[in-house]
Amino acid sequence: MPNTQPVGVAFADPEFTTCYASQEIGYSSAAQGAVTQATSKSTGVTLNKSAGKITMNGAALAAGTTVLFTLTNSTISANGVMIVNVGAGGTSGAYWPYVASLTAGSAVIGLYNNTAGSLSEAPVINFALIHGQ
């Protein structure tokens, strides 16, 4: 362990950090944004924020299929983590969102239709980044 000093039988290491919160932890409103897909569910979007909402296009998504689109975002680093979920705009439980890949400046997001029928809805995908170094 770098930066360690023996102290009896224990070690003091300044790399350890603890965060205690008595209120919500999250991003300020200035770090959040929203964007809407223009022409199809596979159309890429750009939103340079650490958290936000992506309103997908209302085009049909066949049963049991996945669509992929690219989110271009200058706040994404290759060492970051992206969390996604469906927040509104679609049949509850019908969609499974996921991050297919993450590179500096962009993420490929997938949306799977988990139903037995085609859906023509505009689900809203919420996302938040955990920034890595």
Model features per residue range: what roles?
Residues P2-I76, L102-Q133:
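Extracellular receptor-binding modules and their adjoining Ser/Thr/Gly/Asp/Asn-rich linkers
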Residues G80-S92:
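Terminal beta-strand-rich extracellular "head" domains
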Residues G93-L102:
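Glycan-recognition/cleft segments
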